[in-house]
Amino acid sequence: MKTWLFFTFLFSCSSFYASCRYAEVRSIHEVAGDILYDEENFWLILDLDDTLLQGGEALSHSIWKSKAIQGLQKQGTPEQEAWEAVVPFWIEIQEMGTVQPIESAIFLLIEKIQKQGKTTFVYTERPKTAKDLTLKQLHMLNVSLEDTAPQPQAPLPKNLLYTSGILFSGDYHKGPGLDLFLEICTPLPAKIIYIDNQKENVLRIGDLCQKYGIAYFGITYKAQELHPPIYFDNIAQVQYNYSKKLLSNEAAALLLRHQMHE
C-alpha cells in the first residue's frame, strides 16, 4: 500500500453521474501520480495563499490577516466589513514583505501538467486590487499560468478579475467567484481537480462541481504544517508598530528583546 494512503481520506459520491473524491495530504507527492496520470479532460485549479506561497514575515502572513478579521468580528463588526477593513492593509504589508514557496514540488507538478496541455489556473480570495502584487509574487517563484488558463466566453461581474491565469474573487469564503466564472465558460471540463489548504473551501468547490455535474477531486493540502512557523503574535505586534518599513522576523525579535531589557 502506498505511503500516502496513511495520510489521505478518500471517498466517492455521485451527482449527475459525476464522481467525487477527496484527499488530505501533507505533500503534493502523495497525489502527484493520481493527477499526472489522470486521463480525463480536467482543469487543475489551485488556491494561492498557504497553498502555493506564504508571507515571509509574521505581519505579512495570512494568519495575521485571519486573526485581525476575527478580532474585529469579536468586537461586533460584520464578517464582510471586517474583511474589507483588514485586507487592504494586509496587501500593503505584502508589498513590503517577502514571499516563500510552500513546497517546491507543487511547481514542478504545475509545469508537468502544463506540458500535457491541461488547463491550469489559480483561484484566490484576494481582491482584484492585489493583481500587480500577485503577479510579482508568482514571477518571483517562476510560475506562469497564462498559456494554459481557460478563456471565459463573456465578461465577468465587476467585482471579479481574471487575468494571466488568476481569478481574483474578493470572496471571504470560496465558491461564489468560481460559480460565476463557470457560468460563462464553454465548454466546461469533465473534471476539476482543486487544491487548497482549507478543507471547508475544498468541500465548497466539491458542492459547486456537483451543481454542474462535473467530476471532482478535492485535495486539502497541509504541506505548510511541515514548515517552521512564521507567524508569532508578539513579532507581528512589533512589526505592526513599525509598519512604515516592515521589519523581518529576526529584526523584530531583536527589537522585542531590547524592549524587554529596558
From Swiss-Prot:
It is found in: Cell outer membrane. Keywords: Cell outer membrane, Membrane, Signal. Its main location: membrane. It comes from Chlamydia pneumoniae. Residues 1-17 form the signal peptide. InterPro entries: DUF2608 (IPR022565), HAD-like_sf (IPR036412). It is a peripheral membrane protein. The keyword Membrane applies. One of its GO terms (cellular component) is cell outer membrane. This is Putative outer membrane protein CPn_1034/CP_0818/CPj1034/CpB1074. The keyword Nucleotide-binding does not apply.
